Amino acid sequence: MKFRTLAVALGISAAALLAIPGSGATASLQTGTERMQTGPNQVANRYLKQQLVWKQCGDPEYRTFCAKITAPRDWSNQYSGNDIELAVSKVTPVGKSKTKPSRVIFGNPGGPGGAGLGMAPYLASQAALAKDHLFIGFDPRGTGDSANVTCEGAPGFTMDARDRDSSNLDLISEAALLTRPYCERQSRGLLPFVNTAQTVQDIDLIRQLLGYDKIDWVGYSGGTWLGAYYQTYFPAHVGRFVLDSNTDFTKPWSDTFLAQPQAFERRFREDFAPWAAKHDDKLGLGGSPRLVIRTYERLRRELKKQPAVEEFLDGSVKISYDQNALDDIIAGDMYTKADFQSLAIDLAFLRDLSAAQTKGGPKAAQRKVDALPLARQHELVRRATRSTVGLRPLGRPFADDAEDATFTAVTCNDTPWPQGREYGDQLAARLGPKYPLLGWGMNENPCFYWDRPALEMPVPTGKGLPTTLMVQSVHDPATSLSLATSAHHRYAGSRLLTITGEGDHGVYGGVNKCADKIINTFLTTGVAPAKDLSCKGEGIPAPSVPDSEDDGAGAPLRRIAGFTKEVSGYLQ
């Protein structure tokens, strides 16, 4: 993204959105009358005396061991008897099984709500770090193998966000309004305590149980928010922190999400569409960016008029492709250029599937699916059921309910949001015409109706901290460059490493050799760049023939998700 503040990028700011010009609409900013304690709490001895029992999780090749720790449900009320369990993973450097590594590095993949046990083997796979770090991953409270929250049964957003009919807007509003009651009723009292203030204290408990004075950190996406707040709550225990693909952690969550419609639209129109047009001879979506976008819009209209509901794998899986599914597929594939080829192939398939259905009816479309090789059917099922990696857009659910519920709890609990339906509808009406991929769905947000806990967290400033290294690609769709530059200017002592000509969300670990070298130097030596730096992007690769299933190479967050899948479920 060109260097522009959020106010310029969207023509609007979080403060200005409280009164949208020309609409007559106003929205109150949500506040609490009684405040939860905002600083860290002294830890009760019973939590510090617990012994961690490590067991191997996953195949031996991952060298990963996992344990459960006990933490209070509410850190400001440690003697209530209401405890929760948290899942932690570790990988010890080769040759250090009997000696304590000199440093410990924690990782978080973001979400917020992403399970993170896979961060330990992922970080251990970075050769530059492998000598003398203990690698730690964890599932934050609410998700993964830790104590879960759930919103199961909540209606969700199945409507077409572009439909501005009053009855459709009623349905969107009612779905958003009903989300919290479902979450609260089924989460057994945990929901208000799934927030960043509680989670950073969980992290520091892990630090103390491991016996380290300071931690290093690699946080992606929502993990930049969590990392900055850990620094704010526990500055004396901060080591070398890398914040990759940045939220604006110096402002409320709303600022970060308000930047997404433009950033996703830019990634789609300025990165994917020109790339697809350049390779039209192989992909067949149109010979110009305008024609590629036209292919998408035409397909969206057809799938709205007549969704394609197909059976895969001999009827064992049924997938419904409608306009929302199409938008979700596109948004999900904007996070990494490694998914561009799969997206192009899927768009061509859906175009042909829809055409077959229009011409010959549902049976003709099903015959087209049945003719696909089993490997291709498996790939379509995998892509249809995957979770978003990185900071997801509003209204787009994770495949996993606990991740989805944790995302909602953290983003709605942490910081105030403007309240009320009128605000959300006016926001969507303003952003939708400019940024149709996501803008119309900006009213699909439970936070506009959320009864927050009385929580007020200190604003991260960076003052008194060691250097923080912030890393950002310029066309990141989920966390816009505008957010990184805004936070960087407000975060004392930070350095910003920008990757130009790049749009991947999540950089460290294979996206850019220049960036990896700078980050590894910082993490292994503590030597930070003396000034802000930039690296040149390595470009979007041409389509390969034939398309091979993506193994996550060059896409760090996909690799982390793969590791997490392999090492989870062993602590039940």
Each PLM stretch: what is its role?
Residues C151-A161, Y229-T295, I330-G332, Q341, ...:
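A catalytic-pocket lid/entrance helix-loop region that shapes and gates access to the active site
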Residues Y182-G189, V200-K214:
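Conserved acidic catalytic loop of the alpha/beta-hydrolase fold
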Residues P477-S482:
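Conserved alpha/beta-hydrolase "acid-adjacent" motif
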Residues G464, L469-Q472:
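Short beta-strand/loop motif that positions the catalytic acidic residue
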Residues T500-V507:
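Histidine-bearing beta->alpha loop at or near hydrolase active sites
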Residues T26, R294-L465, P541, A555-Q572:
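Alpha/beta-hydrolase fold active-site neighborhood
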Residues Y212-G222:
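Alpha/beta-hydrolase fold nucleophile elbow
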Residues F3-G11, I20-N168, V218, R290-R294, ...:
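Catalytic-loop region of hydrolases
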